[in-house]
Amino acid sequence: MGESAESGSRQLPAMSPPRRSVAYRRKIVDALWWAACVCCLAVVITPTLWMLIGVVSRAVPVFHWSVLVQDSQGNGGGLRNAIIGTAVLAIGVILVGGTVSVLTGIYLSEFATGKTRSILRGAYEVLSGIPSIVLGYVGYLALVVYFDWGFSLAAGVLVLSVMSIPYIAKATESALAQVPTSYREAAEALGLPAGWALRKIVLKTAMPGIVTGMLVALALAIGETAPLLYTAGWSNSPPTGQLTDSPVGYLTYPIWTFYNQPSKSAQDLSYDAALLLIVFLLLLIFIGRLINWLSRRRWDV
């Protein structure tokens, strides 16, 4: 019995796989996972780089500074009216959509409870899933036709603001949720008014995240074409300041319209507009990243 037990114990190590084979299989699995990750990353990055290279290589040779100082004239001219119109639309979205969205996010994070919070969250999640062209058509029927605003700055700003509400509200709610609970508890323990603590402590801490979400939502809104075709129309002149019955130019219109024209000057202007829009969107994203970096650096210090 002793010999059989001893021989069995000697055979046990032979039943376990060699360590080298286990390590080798792990390396193979890791390599396959890394290869899959690289392939997925390439699927996302390659079309983006291809688009950027195509636009830049086509726009830079034909770009001239007169595009920035001349208004559109038919299918030619410059893009000053579109640049100013895009900037005015962006400011309007920040003022209207940003205000409503931030207040919505604050209410959901700090005051709403139970069923009310669930209903509001469900509402803006549904809103985020509605195609932009549908929002544009609804805006056309409601604002342009029913309220008789005509193609105008106000109609375009309002539709883009509605589009941006889900993204900014979600970003605001997430930024407020990341504020440590100890900040609120300390303010309450010191007897500070709830409104004062919210403005001076909670919102101040969450502001970088709110601003970043607002800039990302603004970049998404400004890159839209269909909602503005239905609401803002198009104008060869810069905005006059009139809110209704005054069409507005914007950079996505020449990209969509001039590209299909047989004239080479119109196609060149389309690529110039695409280049300017890409620069504008990248600038917004860069500002958002810079705000995040400065915020983290401040808290690390």
Swiss-Prot record:
Pfam families assigned: BPD_transp_1
Report how it sits in the membrane: Multi-pass membrane protein
Q: Which GO terms describe its cellular component?
A: plasma membrane
Induction behaviour: Transcription slightly induced by phosphate starvation, part of the pstB3-pstS2-pstC1-pstA2 operon.
User: Mind listing the GO molecular function terms for this protein?
Assistant: phosphate transmembrane transporter activity
Q: In its UniProt record, which GO terms are filed under biological process?
A: phosphate ion transmembrane transport
- What PROSITE patterns does UniProt report for this protein, alphabetically? ABC_TM1
Spans traversing the lipid bilayer: 36-56, 83-103, 127-147, 149-169, 209-229, 274-294
Task: State whether keyword ATP-binding applies.
Answer: no
**Keywords assigned:** Cell membrane, Membrane, Phosphate transport, Transmembrane, Transmembrane helix, Transport
Q: Which InterPro entries match?
A: MetI-like, MetI-like_sf, Phosphate_PstA, Phosphate_transprt_permease
Asked whether the UniProt record includes Translocase among its keywords, one would answer no
Q: Where is the ABC transmembrane type-1 domain?
A: 83-288
Localization terms from the record: Cell membrane
The record's subunit annotation is:
The complex is composed of two ATP-binding proteins (PstB), two transmembrane proteins (PstC and PstA) and a solute-binding protein (PstS).
Q: Main role?
A: Part of the binding-protein-dependent transport system for phosphate; probably responsible for the translocation of the substrate across the membrane.
Q: What family name appears in the similarity comment?
A: Belongs to the binding-protein-dependent transport system permease family. CysTW subfamily.
Q: What is this protein called?
A: Phosphate transport system permease protein PstA 2
